[in-house]
């Protein structure tokens, strides 16, 4: 996978992570199983800061939430994302893999697929959260959305029980 056909183009792999155990496992899986493929191109580790979800405060106060509260929530999401990426980068270094880290703000499903296209990713790797069928219907599934909408092959890594 490191060299692509006649062009000799390095393949780009993106691992989408969040704070879940399943995304951490997906990163570890890539580092253990695709390490030789990552020697000619940095691994892209990607996380998404969700939009601030403080709409419940609107109902309680019958107005807009204070700007300070919005900024505090946004700052918390930013710090969490940066911490996740820093830990992921350290794990990559321990495996001898160069990583490029990127954080975006938005809906995770859409942001991941947009990043795949923008960064010309050749393989997207996501973890499986193991939601049941009912949860997937009501909550949606990032991995399912990416499988149907990403402009590259998608590998869903599920931790064996």
List PLM regions with ranges:
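Glycine-rich, Arg-bearing micro-motifs that act as flexible, cationic patches
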Residues: 12, 123-148
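Generic structural signal for helix capping and beta-alpha/helix-loop junctions
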Residues: 52-53, 109-111, 133
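Small/aliphatic-rich secondary-structure junction motif
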Residues: 2-68, 75, 90-100
């Amino acid at each position: 996978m490191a060299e692509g056909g006649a062009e000799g183009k390095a393949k780009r792999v993106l691992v989408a992570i969040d704070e879940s155990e399943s995304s951490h496992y997906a990163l570890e899986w890539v580092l253990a199983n695709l390490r030789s493929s990552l020697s000619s191109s940095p691994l892209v580790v990607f996380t998404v800061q969700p939009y601030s979800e403080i709409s419940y405060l609107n109902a309680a106060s019958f107005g807009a939430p204070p700007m300070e509260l919005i900024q505090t929530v946004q700052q918390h999401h930013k710090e969490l994302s940066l911490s996740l990426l820093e830990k992921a980068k350290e794990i990559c270094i321990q495996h001898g893999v160069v990583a490029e880290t990127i954080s975006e703000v938005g809906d995770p499903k859409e942001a991941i697929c947009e990043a795949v296209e923008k960064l010309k990713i050749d393989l997207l790797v996501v973890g499986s959260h193991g939601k049941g069928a009912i949860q997937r219907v009501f909550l949606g599934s990032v991995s399912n959305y990416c499988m149907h909408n990403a402009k590259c092959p998608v590998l869903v890594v599920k931790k064996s029980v």
